[in-house]
From Swiss-Prot:
Name assigned to this protein: Altered inheritance of mitochondria protein 39, mitochondrial
Subcellular localization: Mitochondrion membrane
Keywords: Membrane, Mitochondrion, Transit peptide, Transmembrane, Transmembrane helix
Phylogenetic placement of the source organism: Eukaryota, Fungi, Dikarya, Ascomycota, Saccharomycotina
Cellular component GO terms, alphabetical: mitochondrial membrane
Domain of life, source organism: Eukaryota
Topology term for the membrane: Single-pass membrane protein
Length: 395
């Protein structure tokens, strides 16, 4: 553009002075039009920008192409205009982004729509003249849909959490412990009672007939020395037929020292004979349901052993009641690392109205805890007489 216009502008000071003299005394309508089309080169700062004026000599021959180029040059934006337009665009963009971010904020009341859209919907319904009943039904249906969606999502989250926990536990117990390490694994299910019946495996290790005979002898020995029995029943103690009293009922059970849980024991499927009843998954593992105690002290010992310490390094508990007959020295089942109480209960009938009831514990020898006499008196009342009670024993 400068190449087209440079020949029509004065190149020295003399030409500029001659041009000014020629333009100063004469003012006509054509000159006024020339000033409007090509203003004098004079930069005046205004509030909104810079105005550039150009003037062409009166006698100069200006082609149409050159005049058009000069007009285009006068209409070109300046640096101030470009800078101002850039700032305005950036401010407008920031305002629009803030407005859009505020519109897209979600809360508990607007699940499927934004607050702005809901306001527009309400205004449109009011302008159209919808009845409040239809509006309430719509809101109620939307609320039910939101509640259903939240409940469904909550169920999915909890299902994923429990499924992940179950998968990790089962993978560690079965895949890692049993299949990879070829070890026994115990998977606890729910708490169980500390008192339970003796299993068939336990009964093989305990001579129940011997315990029954020993308990009867100990009971008769104690009753023979009791004053009430001597006075009212005589010594030796006999039944109504004049024979030695017999046991009407005798039972045994065991009690664990620690809290117990019921769970599943899993082992590698080695097809060995066992006294337990196993359920097999071919070529994978065998499993059965059993009860196991939770030894708190044993758990602490295991944790200390892993870091190279022992319980005796920190403290030592000396309990004076841990003597013969206590939990520490009770009958241990083979293969188990915990002690058990072996309890027994028996009944001896003296006559139709008198019954001897006793209970105690067994460990190598019988240790009686209590002997009671239940007798129906002449007035028809059933009375319990405590003939013997071991105060020092743990019941």
């Amino acid at each position: 553009m400068w190449g087209l216009c440079k020949n029509h502008f004065p190149s020295n000071k003399i030409q500029v002075q001659e041009r000014n003299k020629a333009l100063k005394p004469k003012k006509s309508g054509s000159e006024h039009k020339t000033k409007q089309l090509f203003p004098v080169f004079n930069c005046k700062k205004k509030e909104k920008g810079v105005m550039i004026r150009f003037a062409i000599l009166r006698n100069a021959n200006t082609s149409l192409l050159s005049a058009r180029s000069i007009c285009l040059f006068t209409q070109a934006p300046t640096y101030c205009h470009v800078r101002l337009n850039t700032l305005n665009k950036s401010i407008t963009t920031k305002r629009n982004s803030l407005t859009e971010s505020k519109r897209h904020v979600h809360d508990g009341k607007h699940f499927f729509t934004t607050p702005h859209q809901q306001q527009q919907t309400k205004l449109g319904e009011i302008e159209e003249g919808h009845s409040p009943n239809i509006k309430g039904e719509d809101l109620r249906s939307i609320g039910q849909a939101i509640t259903h969606q939240r409940n469904k999502r909550r169920k999915q989250i909890w299902s994923a959490i429990f499924g992940g926990i179950f998968g990790v536990i089962l993978g560690y117990s079965l895949i890692y412990r049993v299949i990879y390490l070829k070890e026994q694994s115990f998977l606890p299910l729910f708490p169980s009672s500390k008192i339970r019946k003796l299993s068939s495996r336990d009964l093989k290790k305990v001579d129940v007939n011997q315990v029954q005979k020993l308990s009867k002898l100990r009971v008769l020995e104690i009753l023979s020395g009791h004053d009430m029995i001597k006075e009212q029943y005589g010594v030796p103690l006999l039944d109504k037929d004049g024979n030695s009293p017999t046991l009407n009922e005798f039972s045994m059970w065991c009690e664990d020292q620690d809290p117990c849980v019921t769970g599943i024991v899993m082992e590698p499927d080695d097809k060995r004979d066992s006294s337990h009843t196993w359920y097999r998954i071919p070529f994978v593992c065998k499993w059965r349901i059993t009860h196991r105690p939770i030894s708190i002290r044993g758990t602490i010992d295991d944790l200390l052993n892993r870091i190279g310490l022992e319980t005796s390094d920190l403290f030592e508990i000396i309990s004076p009641e841990r003597v013969y007959g206590s939990f520490k020295y009770e009958y241990p089942l083979q293969g188990d690392s915990h002690a058990l109480h072996l309890w027994f209960h028996g009944e001896i009938e003296l006559d139709d109205d008198s019954l001897i009831v006793y209970n105690g514990k067994y460990h190598v020898d019988v240790k009686l805890q209590e002997i009671d006499l239940f007798r129906r008196e002449k007035n028809g009342q059933l009375v319990q007489y405590v003939l013997y009670k071991n105060e020092a024993g743990d019941k």
